[in-house]
């Protein structure tokens, strides 16, 4: 079973992009509350 590098990159981006987006929103909200 070969590892499809493009599928791996797509999966990594699919996970990292929303995570980074949520982290940015969290940091902005935390700084506003402070």
Swiss-Prot record:
Q: Where in the cell is it found?
A: Plastid, Chloroplast thylakoid membrane
InterPro entries, sorted: PSII_PsbM, PSII_PsbM_sf
Transcription regulation keyword on record: no
| GO cellular component annotations of the record | chloroplast thylakoid membrane; photosystem II
* Membrane topology classification: Single-pass membrane protein
**From its record, what is one biological process in GO terms?**
photosynthesis, light reaction
Regions crossing the membrane = 5-25
Which keywords does this Swiss-Prot/TrEMBL entry list?
Answer: Chloroplast, Membrane, Photosynthesis, Photosystem II, Plastid, Reaction center, Thylakoid, Transmembrane, Transmembrane helix
Question: What family name appears in the similarity comment?
Answer: Belongs to the PsbM family.
Relate the assembly described in the record.
PSII is composed of 1 copy each of membrane proteins PsbA, PsbB, PsbC, PsbD, PsbE, PsbF, PsbH, PsbI, PsbJ, PsbK, PsbL, PsbM, PsbT, PsbX, PsbY, PsbZ, Psb30/Ycf12, at least 3 peripheral proteins of the oxygen-evolving complex and a large number of cofactors. It forms dimeric complexes.
Q: Function, please?
A: One of the components of the core complex of photosystem II (PSII). PSII is a light-driven water:plastoquinone oxidoreductase that uses light energy to abstract electrons from H(2)O, generating O(2) and a proton gradient subsequently used for ATP formation. It consists of a core antenna complex that captures photons, and an electron transfer chain that converts photonic excitation into a charge separation. This subunit is found at the monomer-monomer interface.
- The protein in question is named Photosystem II reaction center protein M
Tell me the organism. Sorghum bicolor
Lineage, uppermost ranks: Eukaryota, Viridiplantae, Streptophyta, Embryophyta, Tracheophyta
